[in-house]
Amino acid sequence: MSKIKKGDDVIVIAGKDKGKRGTVLRVMKPDLVVVEGVNRLKKHQRPNPNKGDTGGIVEMDSPIQVSNIAIYNPATRKADRIGFKTVEGKGKARCFRSNEELIDA
């Protein structure tokens, strides 16, 4: 079971975007994730008349290491670690380490 999943609210804990919050858009194996609004790059795109692209400078989100992000805990309003807890009827579920609240309710 993966600790970080698509749709999780995360906070960057290291790197040039330290302190920024965003939502996970994509999880790329083995240890990269794309977070909305974090690690933005400018790409110079060539026009393509077949697809209808006008070209120009396009800003896009680029992948960031999983080790540089932590899940955001709304109860404590801080970055938190993820643990696993066994729940009857559901099996293993993710939880916050600080207050043992379930993430996937």
UniProtKB/Swiss-Prot annotation:
Any one of the GO BP annotations: translation
UniProt keyword list: Ribonucleoprotein, Ribosomal protein, RNA-binding, rRNA-binding
Molecular function as annotated in GO: rRNA binding; structural constituent of ribosome
Transmembrane domains' residue ranges: none
SMART domains: KOW (SM00739)
KW rRNA-binding (keyword) present: yes
SUPFAM superfamilies for the chain: Translation proteins SH3-like domain
Superkingdom as given in the UniProt entry: Bacteria
Pfam annotation, one family: KOW
GO cellular component: ribonucleoprotein complex; ribosome
Subunit comment: Part of the 50S ribosomal subunit.
Biological function: One of two assembly initiator proteins, it binds directly to the 5'-end of the 23S rRNA, where it nucleates assembly of the 50S subunit. One of the proteins that surrounds the polypeptide exit tunnel on the outside of the subunit.
Similarity remark: Belongs to the universal ribosomal protein uL24 family.
Protein name: Large ribosomal subunit protein uL24
Species annotation: Nitrosospira multiformis (strain ATCC 25196 / NCIMB 11849 / C 71)
Organism lineage string: Bacteria, Pseudomonadati, Pseudomonadota, Betaproteobacteria, Nitrosomonadales
Gene: rplX
